[in-house]
Structure formats: structure tokens, C-alpha cells
């Protein structure tokens, strides 16, 4: 079931926030573009109020990504979007019960290429059904189908929450024996069919060869807040991740990297 907010109310809130000096707003809806019709109506309504606020969301489902949606998001003022696909391999997507297939992932990539909004692609390696072959299939997708203008974020392992489908899978496979109370500290699932060292090496090599790829460790690097502040004073607009390629090149010149 969905709890939907009225598009007019949301648009009015954006206008009010803009009057208070807020120039950047991010939608943290779990799946922004589902229901699809509601997302279209929302973007159409925001576009009509002609706000100058920069909008973002990194919660798009590839199943509902098409030219119509991305077009109205551009008109509404979105300057950054993200698609959480987790994998491009059908074997993994089916085990995760994502509700979409690799075909939808590839189709979404073609749509994104036809538009100007920069896109952050989010992958999680090591889920149920993951093998060396599925890892390489997902990396091939990222390397061949994600534009250099866009960014890929690679994460390894999927956090297990008590009572979820992943929790049941991990216990059935003998990977997880902790009680729910013992899982307050994060516990992660990694497919027994993939060796961690091999996976880390494959992902590391792909990131090293592609300046628009990164891992979550980059987000916590101590010098990033200073770079963010410098970008603000230089007038560089969010989202900062869209500058990953340029930033990594500069850091490599200084002998560092993300």
C-alpha cells in the first residue's frame, strides 16, 4: 500500500522552502517513480509552479524509467537522479525479488543516455544467487552502458535485517546464526558462491579503470567536506557526485584517489 502526498501540496511546500532560502531539495521516497502516474503528476505540477529549486532523488526503479518520466523530471527541475539496480544479472535480481529483470536495467540505461540529467547507478554485489559470472555480467553492464557523464557506486555485501527475506535465506544457508538482538550492529550477507578477496579485486580493478566509478568508502574520506565547501564557494552546484570523474582525475594528479 502507498501513502501518497497531494502533488499540489508538495509543489506548494517547495515554493515555500524556496522563499525561505532553500535552493536544493532531495526526495527520499523509497521508490520515487512508483506509482508511475503519481510521479508524472507530481513532476507536472512542480513544473507548472516554475520554481528554481534544484531537485534530486536517488530512488528510481528501472521498471518505471522511460522517456516520458525523465522528460517531466527535467521540466520540474531535477538536476540529479539515481537508479538502485543492485545487479544487472537476472539470476541475482530474481533471488532478490526485485520485480524487474536485466532487460529493464539495460532499457533504463538507454533512456538515461537520451536525456541530460546526470544519473547515479547503485549496485550491491554479493547478494543471493551471486556468482563470479553474475559479478562479471554486472561489471560489463556498468563499463559498457553507463555514460562517462554518469556515476556508478559499487557496494559489497547487503545488510541483513531481522525478519526479512534475506534473513530467511541467510539462516537457511547457514550463514547467519545470530539472534535479532545481536543484529543491532550491522550484519551483511555475501553469497557463498563468491570469494570476498576475488570480489574485492574485481571491483577494485573496475573502479581503477573507470574514473566515474566509486565505492562507498569514498563518501567518508576526511578531505571530502573541504572539497565540498570549496565547490560551494566556487559556485559548483549539487549533486557533488556528478563531478566524480573530474574529482578523481584531480586527486590522482595529487597522488590520491577516492
What are these regions (language model features)?
Residues 37, 91, 95-96, 125-133, ...:
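Flexible glycine/acidic-rich beta-alpha junction loops that bind and position SAM and/or redox cofactors
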Residues 1-120, 125-127, 140:
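Radical SAM [4Fe-4S] cluster-binding motif and immediate context
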Residues 70-81, 137-155, 181-182:
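Structural recognition of alpha->loop->beta junctions
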Residues 21, 165-170, 175-258:
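Radical SAM enzyme core and accessory elements
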Residues 19, 101, 147, 175-176:
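Residue-level marker of structural boundaries
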Residues 46, 142-146, 203-207:
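Hydrophobic, Leu/Ile/Phe/Ala-enriched alpha-helical segments that form helix-helix packing faces
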Residues 119, 152-153, 216:
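Bilobed periplasmic-binding protein-like "clamshell/Venus-flytrap" ligand-binding domains
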